[in-house]
């Protein structure tokens, strides 16, 4: 078969297959054009998921008739005046989006340039061009795409439902809106709920307002401000508290010079920073902006411009990891307030005044049963208080008599308050100036030990304590191999493991930071964890795995009674320790309930 030149319309349709994958792809190109035109308001409307109609209206600088004529020609653009691909400062630059769309749909553009008396119109219907011609149009541009993929009907079979496609388009608008808070965005659809995002100041507070409008108000309550700079690369944004984690990475948004990207390097750096804090399979919420010289990043490496390449990827990754870790460390013991709100919701629903049908609560004492049913086992952690002892409860079954003395003023002023009781020998209840705090003693102490072990390893040499008689631990062959492979790593933490014949190892020294550890159990748990991790994990992940296992072994266990001074010491240590708001598995170590919220449970507010 001879080689022949392809028809120009066919060329455009092939190009459209790369650039325009779905309605959301076309919408993204149109919004980027509007932003490059300096628009301050962008209104989007779609019908049937974008298949029937995509309309984008902006108040940007607009185009003169001669520019409008060229705009629908292949590889015609106003965004590369110097022809330099190494210094791209606009969102669009290839000049192929509009002709690609016009080759597979009915594309109509109305535009009026600033200072022009009249606007112009051009239409391209599946590759057939009409115009430009004069048309009534306010300053700015209106682009309408009708019957998308009419020129390539086979592509329609690969689209999802109208609702799913509309949701994808809404997400595109939201993502670009987060990058440009100074622009007002409107979105209307026949398939999903629309929205209107008011313009905000292009400042940290203004951006947080825009992010909260997109990601929900809980993001504001759980967001930590991030800011760092290194060798001309600047990072700014907000990162969610580790205890406010999500089931997917959908709430992770990264922008490079104002361009939204889904780059593995950047998302991997965020994952590495949170590795110490999140449960397996959970993801942090964050919005990060990287700003650098356009010459330091290549944005022309992906058909949809969704990925970028940095000239120095190590610098960028190090900046993100370092900045996020420092931000999380500065948060100290802070945990998500959503945990307290969730606890209040559970209490409210289980309380005697809750109406399961959603109606008003019944507060009529005459209708209250004479002997209300309750589970006596639920009160097993409490003993009957002596008469007239409400001022100082002396006999919670698991109480360590923390209430025997009034809390000191200094402890009450502390963020986590003064310990008043221990419940079920597992939870510490403390009183603050404006509420109460409930602490999981094992989870909290586990995190404290974990951070101490990390600090000890960062020093010159972790202190050890030699065992008078080495502990001989019998293990499976795979476990012996795994723990001996990690022997050098374990020695950095002060744990010395030596081979002891087939199927066994000897523990000769343990970390001095671990008080009275069980060396046999510690070795077995470490071996099992290392085998489960396949031994092929990154070195940092293996460090964290070893640290977490050791910390768990030396933590205050649930079921251990604690004296008041021990409980208060634990609270003060939590306040001083970075990351103590969550345990090594990502669970919260405490829940805070404000007095005003507790009073609502009892109808006082």
UniProtKB/Swiss-Prot annotation:
Q: Is DNA repair a UniProt keyword of this protein? A: yes
Q: Under the GO molecular function aspect, what terms does this record hold? A: ATP binding; ATP hydrolysis activity; ATP-dependent DNA damage sensor activity; mismatched DNA binding
Q: What does this protein do?
A: This protein is involved in the repair of mismatches in DNA. It is required for dam-dependent methyl-directed DNA mismatch repair. May act as a 'molecular matchmaker', a protein that promotes the formation of a stable complex between two or more DNA-binding proteins in an ATP-dependent manner without itself being part of a final effector complex.
CC annotations in GO: mismatch repair complex
State one Pfam family annotation: DNA_mis_repair
The protein, known as: DNA mismatch repair protein MutL
Q: Which domain of life is it from?
A: Bacteria
State the similarity comment. Answer: Belongs to the DNA mismatch repair MutL/HexB family.
Q: Which HAMAP family match?
A: DNA_mis_repair (MF_00149)
Key words of the record: DNA damage, DNA repair
Q: Is DNA repair tagged as a keyword?
A: yes
A Gene Ontology biological process term: mismatch repair
